[in-house]
């Protein structure tokens, strides 16, 4: 069992139940999935760029990646309907907790000029999204083999009903929020 999953079931869930004043353990917010998305607009001109992005995301997530395709043609961006323009991966269960552990303990502290995560990055329903400007903050990515720096989006979906519940959940996992 993943370290954070064990921590959640044994310590965090009972503590959150008491802190949030919930009657049942099943009401306690929990993380359901983590989605990592990498938009690669340059893939329109060069297919090798998308291959490198997919390989980076496979190393970061540890599982197979889905290539996302454009839904409609946009002349201004020079893309057509169905062209590959990015990649994403959805992590659940143990892989999700292992990724979250690496994100909190290793990747976030390696961000340059990091002063804490803004607590305003919640969507109003307890889900949290953050953008990472460089994929090299993850230890799985070898800096010498990177063709170019790419950003990625990390979306943490929770069962929390409000932003306060979601913030309490992520704070319990030692997320480095500002203030």
Swiss-Prot record:
Any one annotated GO CC term: ribosome
Keywords linked to the UniProt accession: Ribonucleoprotein, Ribosomal protein, RNA-binding, rRNA-binding, tRNA-binding
Superkingdom, taxonomy of origin: Bacteria
GO molecular function: rRNA binding; structural constituent of ribosome; tRNA binding
SUPFAM superfamilies in the cross-refs: RL5-like
GO annotation, biological process: translation
Any matching Pfam family: Ribosomal_L5
Entries under InterPro entries matching the protein: Ribosomal_uL5, Ribosomal_uL5_bac-type, Ribosomal_uL5_C, Ribosomal_uL5_CS, Ribosomal_uL5_dom_sf, Ribosomal_uL5_N
Quaternary structure and interacting proteins, as annotated: Part of the 50S ribosomal subunit; part of the 5S rRNA/L5/L18/L25 subcomplex. Contacts the 5S rRNA and the P site tRNA. Forms a bridge to the 30S subunit in the 70S ribosome.
Function: This is one of the proteins that bind and probably mediate the attachment of the 5S RNA into the large ribosomal subunit, where it forms part of the central protuberance. In the 70S ribosome it contacts protein S13 of the 30S subunit (bridge B1b), connecting the 2 subunits; this bridge is implicated in subunit movement. Contacts the P site tRNA; the 5S rRNA and some of its associated proteins might help stabilize positioning of ribosome-bound tRNAs.
Entries under HAMAP family matching the protein: Ribosomal_uL5_B (MF_01333_B)
Family named by the database record: Belongs to the universal ribosomal protein uL5 family.
Protein name, per record: Large ribosomal subunit protein uL5
Organism: Cellvibrio japonicus (strain Ueda107)
């Amino acid at each position: 069992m993943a370290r954070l999953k064990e921590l959640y079931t044994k310590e965090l869930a009972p503590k959150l139940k008491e802190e949030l004043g919930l009657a049942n353990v099943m009401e306690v917010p929990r993380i359901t999935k983590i989605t990592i998305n990498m938009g690669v607009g340059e893939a329109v001109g060069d297919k090798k760029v998308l291959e490198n992005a997919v390989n980076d995301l496979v190393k970061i997530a540890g599982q197979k990646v889905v290539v996302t395709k454009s839904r409609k043609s946009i002349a201004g961006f020079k893309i057509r309907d169905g062209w590959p323009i990015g990649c994403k991966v959805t992590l659940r269960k143990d892989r999700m907790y292992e990724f979250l552990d690496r994100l909190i303990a290793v990747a976030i502290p390696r961000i340059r000029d990091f002063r804490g995560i803004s607590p305003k990055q919640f969507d109003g329903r307890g889900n949290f999204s953050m953008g990472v400007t460089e994929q090299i903050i993850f230890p799985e990515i070898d800096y010498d083999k990177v063709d170019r720096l790419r950003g990625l989006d990390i979306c943490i979906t929770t069962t929390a009903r409000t932003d306060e519940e979601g913030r309490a959940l992520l704070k319990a996992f030692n997320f480095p929020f500002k203030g």
